[in-house]
Amino acid sequence: MTKWFDTNYHFIVPEWSADTEFKVNAKNLLAQIKEAKAQGYDIKPTLVGPVTLAWLGKKKDGINCRVKDLLLPKLLPAYAQLLRELAAEGADWVQIDEPILAAEAGSAWLDAFAPVYQELSGTGVRILVGTYFASVAEHLDLLKSLPVQGLHIDCVRAPEQLAVFAEGWPKDRVLSVGLIDGRNVWRANLSKAIATLEPVKAKLGENLWIAPSCSLLHSPQDLAVEEKLDGEIKSWMAFAAQKLVELGVVKRALEQGKDAVQAELAASDAAAADRATNKLIHNDAVKARVAALPKGADQRKSPFA
């Protein structure tokens, strides 16, 4: 097992050998989609992308060439079949996550994106490429060249990239902006999020989507079931269910104006102001001691010490 990028979550590392083959078994996924549709939800299945999947694996004995050259030709027919099955089940959009784009994977892996997504582009679904955990602004030209209909960017970890994509991303394609932190337990500053997105909304209109920065699997499920938390601390928190509510507030503000969510914004502002100064987490004596430390006292001699 190893960590999923820089998170505290782990995954079982796949091992690739020369005789590795791939077959699609979408029974469980399709059952979940049918269940969601039966409850009236619009669906957007999310998959780990083929380039990221191949890159994350470990090469075993018997592979004498580059992993991507061996694996991707085998992976792509399976991905294409899965996308066609999702389309047949009524999926209009499918999110394909490629966090490799935010890692230092090297040019050989980046060169794989164009042929991979060219092959996946005719499968009957609209594709949203998902990125997270770091900026992908340096790959703007590559991402624009892909035959996909949308892109998700993490603007919590890399807020500076929003300006790059707001200006450079094609206006006829979806830009999904992750401004609600999917990796923590704290309420968002909704007034700040709305102010950040208003000029982007003016440029992109309906092609602006708002989203968590990454999957909400990194957050606990629902704050409402927590009965033993300190009341003050609980008032600063938002778990996955509450973060979805926050997204709804931002959406309404962008579509109907801030007056439509005045009460929600007032509550958000009050929580942010309280957390910024509350004595439960702000100790002036500790701050003074830290400020008095000699220069360099908070740094290790070796980054791995």
Describe these PLM feature segments:
Residues 1-305:
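Domain-level signal for soluble alpha/beta catalytic cores
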